[in-house]
Amino acid sequence: MKRLVSTLNLSKEDWLRYRKCGITGTDAGAILGLNPYRSAFQVYHDKISDTIENIDNEAMRQGRDLEDYVAQRFSEETGFKVRRANAIYQSEEHPLLLADFDRLIVGQKAGLECKTDSPFSADKWADGKIPAHYLAQVDHYLAVSGFDCWYVAALIFGKELVIHKIVTDKQVLSDLIDKEELFWTNHVVPQIPPAPNGCDCDTQQINQLYEVDNRDKTADLSALHGLLDKRQELSDQIEQMEQEKTAIEQQVKLQMQDAAYGTAPGYKVSWVSSESKRVDSQRLRKEQPDIFNQYSKNVSSRRFTIIHAA
């Protein structure tokens, strides 16, 4: 591998721009369909767009702030000395593959990926397990670096530090590289988007792409007639299953009567009273229009409906 660019004095915007030039570790899981928070469809649109999206949230902020702590704890637990990479790296054999390592381990052909996670996700790290999209990320780093192994240190908030070692598997890396390069060749280069996979993140991406409708335009969807039939079939099945599910819930309620709780082997059931206060918006608009207008805001969205014409 080679150092593509130093990150010591690189701005966040330029760092993001460099990452558009190839496939990074965090792209790997999304391209493989393993990332629950990001999809291949999103990766594609990020790569072809000139827009630099500096996305951030509290979880990402905490992950950055605690990276030093996780690396320090890893060194304490293993005795290995680590150092910052301070660069975006590029595979010499597969130039499309880029990587931004958290840490490199001094004196070894190995690296370290630092993670933080909720205690509610602790089971995903138990018994040697690693969330699939993180494992894909580490395999990507092994592919770029050519190293023998990579470590993942995950801080489970308030619970424990989990350390896993991933050893290079040449067949796994070969398959990963093939899929990443095919994604780039088949989609990014010709600018042909991959099919969305039904996740919420793809819905958000599509809604962002086409926020405004053209009321004077009607699209010909004849080519999708088979898909529309399939959707209708699925909708009918879901409706039937929802009714069956509700009927079961009704039987359970009849059995519980006024009991707040119920038990069965493997199940705990609750049917408890609760109270909530809601604003009567119609009355507020009628009796206090100034206050209603003061705290109201216009929200623009496109409503999507499909009507089956029998």
Language-model features: where?
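Accessory terminal regions of nucleic-acid processing enzymes
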Residues: 1-310
